[in-house]
Amino acid sequence: GGSLVTSPLLAQEKPGEHLTQPVIHVAKNDVPQAPIQPNHPLDPALRIAYASLQHLRSNINDYSAILIKREFVNGAVSEYEYMGVKVRNRKVSGNNLVTPFSVYMTFLKPAAMKGREVIYVENANKGKLVAHEGGMKGRFLPTVDLDPTGMLAMRGQRYPITDIGIENLVVKLIEKGERDRKHGECTVDFIQGAKISGRDCTVLSVKHPVQRPYFDFHHAQVFIDNELQIPVRYAAYSWPTAGEKAPLLEEYTYQNIKLNVGLTDADFDRDNPNYSF
């Protein structure tokens, strides 16, 4: 439904705030090519996804954003979580990892999580994330190193921190799209005129009318920022029971995105004096 677009959650930015940053070109990473033969409704969507991935890998080194997420976990939909995120995209030259995938997160809402901080850097800290709790718990619990896919780190989460970020989202969309492309029962629509926090987006809507074991969702919407050429929101819904609304599986919205802000190792260092590890 259109209600997504005008959700009060997606607060307006200050008028005139412009998010583009100068584009910095780096060595291109190989991106697999999209299928040529246009014989499945998903093909135009896959072409957009491959182009977006190429753009991310060629032109976007890092970004900061507010991530707002809700997920169906342990039988219920979580409340909205707001996180300030800094992400440095993985960069490879030949077979060498030039820049490891790096994430810093600070939780802003809800109150019980406010102040929680998490850092993950690929190939560092023996593969572990470093975290400390926020809220009341944060006052007496120590900073811990955790396996990203272990039970503690995954509590209340659908996916590990290693899956976070816009590039990972695009990779997942391509994987889902290529898998769904092997089957029929799929309708794809492009809807113009949507806005996410005042920014023009095109919505890619994918529906699988009939529930099948090989489909992940009944309906998914990808909001692509027309200027930034990257997805800024993904929402997926399961099949509704008779007369019910389609239940939410997961939704992720990136707001206040600032590209190529020049993040450094210090942004992903637990000893950063601006952090509370």
Specify the residue positions occupied by each region the protein language model found.
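Hydrophobic transmembrane signal anchors and adjacent membrane-proximal interface regions, especially
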Residues: 10-11, 24, 38-40, 58, ...
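Surface-exposed beta-strand edges and flanking loops
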Residues: 26-28, 87-89, 122, 190-192
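Short leucine-rich amphipathic alpha-helices used at interfaces
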Residues: 36, 42-43, 206-207
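N-terminal mature ectodomain segment of secretory-pathway/periplasmic proteins
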Residues: 40-138
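Gly/Pro-enriched, hydrophobic low-complexity segments
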Residues: 69-74, 106-111, 119, 125-277
